[in-house]
Structure formats: C-alpha cells, structure tokens
C-alpha cells in the first residue's frame, strides 16, 4: 500500500515538476527518503505512469494510461473507503471506522478533519457526541454521493453486498436501457447499487411513477428491492430527467448574452452554446458530486484564460438566479469559454517587414501571413517609410529583411535574410508569443504601486485584499471602481493562484492598458487551501486580447520555478528579474 506521504508526492507532481528538496520540504522528510519513495512509486505504478528526472526542473509525472492510473491510486486511497463507510451508516463511531479500515484509531482521528476539508464543497461531514460521525445531507443527496463513490472506485462495491455475478447482470441491463438517454449505463447501475446498499435506511416518500423499467432491471440482475426502494429509485431518476427538460439551447444563449463584457468579445457561437447546453443537461440528468478521478490543479489554465473563467462565474450566477440547478463543476464551463476565446482570436496584429527588394518582400509577406496566425504584414521599403508607419501604428514586431541597420533603440525586431524559411517562421512565432512583455515588462508592472504589506497572522484574505486595494486607490494607481471590482471578484471564490502567488484582478473600463502591481506579504496566507506568499494586483480590459496573453505568460514563467523560489522573492526588483529571465 502507498502511504500518505507517497500519495502526497503524486499529488504534488500532478500539479507541476518539483525538485527533491521541495518535495522533502512539503512532506517533512529527507531528500534520500524522497528518492526511495520515487523508486517505490515507479514500481507500484507499474507502467501506468512514471516519475522521472527532468533536468533543473526536478522530477515530473508522466501518465500513460490515465484511467488505470486513477483506479490504481484509488486502491491505495483510504479516503474513499472512509467516506463510503460514513455514507453507508447513519452514525459511525471512530472505533468502528478504525476496525472496518483495519487501521489505528489515531489515524482515523487525524484523517477525519482532512477528509472534511477535502470534500467541504461536496458534502458536510459532522459528528454527534455519543453517536459518532455522519454525513449531514438529505437522503437524496446521500444516495447520489454513494452512487458517485461506487462508480468512481469499483473496489468499494463489495461494501454494498453485491456479488460479481449480480454486478455483471446489472451492468448489462443498464447498458441496454433507452428510456433515459442522458444517463449512461454505469451511472444508472451505480444509483441502483447505492439504493440497494441503503435500502433499509430509506424514509423519504416518493410518488408512484408509471412504467416498470427499473423493477425489470433490478430483477434481471438477481437483486431484490422492496416497493419503497423501487419508488425511491424511480422517483430519483425521473426527477433528474424532468429537471433536465428545462434546459434548452435558447435558454443558454439568452443567459450568455447577459454575461457582462461578452458582447465586445463576440465569442457566442453555436459551438459554445452546444457545449454548455450539453454540460448542463448532463449535470441535471446524472449529477456527479464526487469526481470520477482525482482533479489536478486548474490554476495554470485559469491564469492563462482568466477572462474565460471569470465569465463562467458570471454565467453560473445568472443561471442560478433563473434556474435551481445543482451545478458542481464550474471549471468545465470555464474551459468551454476559454475554447471560445481561442476560436475567436481574430484580431490581426501588425508586423512591419523592412525589405528593399520587392519580389522577396511580397513572397515573405505571403509566407508569414499564411503560417503565422492573426498577423498583418505591412511592407516598408526604406527607413523613412518605416519611421512613417511607426508614427501611425505600434508594430508588435519589425522584421529586418534588408541591408539597412536599425537604431539600437528599436528592440522589438529580428533579422531574416533573403526568402524566409521554416526556421524563420518558427523564430517569428516564438518572438510574437512573448516579445511584447518579455522585452519591456516594466510597461505592465510598474515600481510605483508595488510595495510590502505587513499582514498579521490570522488576518483574513478579504481584509488583506481590501487594505492593499485601498492603498493603491490612495496612490492613484487604480480607481475606486476597480478596487471594488477586485474585492468583489475575490469574494466570489475560485481565486486565481499560481505557484504561491495570488492574482486578484478585474476587467477595467477605465484604461485598456494592462497594469500589474507586485506586493510582498509579511506572513504567508492560506487561500482556498493553498498557501500564498505574495500578491499581484492586475487590471486589464477583457477585449484587449493581445494584452490578455500577459496572464498566460505569467503562468508559464511562474511555473518554471520551484515554489520556494517564488516564495523567496524579496520585492519588485526580484520579481522583475524573474520576468526578464523568462
């Protein structure tokens, strides 16, 4: 069995590469122990995944067979079995949990608070003196939670008292049903297993629904359920099916049009509407409160497309105002918005091609516009023409394809000789991806407005954010409206955090230019169960697509370094040095 430390190592490496020293610091053991753990993990993972050294970045995890990998980890994860025991019993004393798990009672006592924290957004774990621990949820939700858990971790199915033959017959019957097309066969079978396991605890009254499909499926599997259990099962499935009927593409499109700032981005298309509609239908017809696999951190994706994930939060708020939907995974909707943003990245960025040979200039212009997305190549045939064009527009890049020498003050240029090659195209792509921030990060992150905030131990994140914003308003770096937007956004949850750096942000209507302010903290703070050491306040315009790439650039730079390097940044100068190195 993998121990808690080894499972934590896997968790850490799922998020990003780590050095042995960093892993040792996070787990409280020596580097030599970490290396032994990695050897044992690779042996246990048995080709489904592998941990390997990747140069200066440290060790990283590569997963080859994703489903098998997650199932193997579940076999070693006692949290699933602990939660299942709590769901299967009305009350469970700690000694009984320890006996069922064949683990010391001290382990259970230590694990219960962590289990509560792990599932705090999913269910409420409570205790009652003299009775024991229990899941404080409605009967309906307890059934769905247990069904999700049995579907996620097949090793728990014997706890429900089901034989292998029963399970095989049940799976076949559920796969062949067609009455509820939005519900997959394995989801239906997990619901039946949960009802069967809880059949003697069901007290809710459900109406009688027409049809006997469920009864036939249960009988085909060789199981027996009483009338009350069959009514509960049928009622639960029909309720979920009827809830899904209220969702339509027109509903979704109407809500999307009400999301603040979405009109200027022009990203509402048939694909986005179809993706979100399908997701909502699945959420209603087959709720999944417990994910079917371990969730990796979404922070890097949220940092790359913050506008998308913020729009998803606004959309979900509007959705909940209009419909009572148990939506439990906002991250997927954020990904759908991110995909829509990528599909509509049609703003063509200006590139000046300085060339004194007409034929070569034309060939190179066609090649660049064909192979480099979202760019517009303007040909300048002399230095004076280049100066004139630059007075009218600010080019993202100047390509010197001539014999002229450019002024040393021009720092956003590359030199390409003769007809451009594939290597030249790749050079242009790489430059465009990061040039505008890499060459002049001071333009976006200014020294004025970056300071040290002396927070005290126990000070809340909301209070810290308010105080920092108040200081920036007093110094006229951000407006009172922007401060209010930042504070409100932080209060919505799903805070943007990348490798020990929190990024409170807002979409400003005051200025189009990105503005970032780096603030160090006196004490580490825990936000969303993650430790942060510094704060980066950011204001940007959601429709300034080009400058939104700063977020993804930031994420890539921050994730290149161990967490201890980010945590050790001493101030603005150290932060800027990090960006210049990128």
From Swiss-Prot:
Q: Which CDD domains match?
A: PTS_IIA_fru
Q: What species is this protein from?
A: Escherichia coli (strain K12)
Which PROSITE patterns does the entry link to? PTS_EIIA_TYPE_2
DNA-binding region, as residue ranges, is located at 20-39
What's noted about domains in the record? Answer: The PTS EIIA type-2 domain may serve a regulatory function, through its phosphorylation activity.
InterPro entries associated with the record: BglG_antiterminators, HTH_11, PTrfase/Anion_transptr, PTS_EIIA_type-2_dom, WH-like_DNA-bd_sf, WH_DNA-bd_sf
Instruction: Report the domain of life of the source organism.
Output: Bacteria
Report the GO molecular function annotations.
Answer: DNA binding; kinase activity
Domain PTS EIIA type-2 spans what residues?
443-582
In its UniProt entry, what is this protein called? Putative frv operon regulatory protein
Query: Could you tell me the keywords of this UniProt record?
Result: DNA-binding, Kinase, Phosphoprotein, Transcription, Transcription regulation, Transferase
NCBIfam families listed in its UniProt record = PRK09863.1 (NF007366)
- Designated gene of the protein: frvR
UniProt function note:
Could be involved in the regulation of the transcription of the FRV operon.
* Enzyme Commission numbers on file: 2.7.1.-
Q: Which residues carry this modification: Phosphohistidine?
A: 505
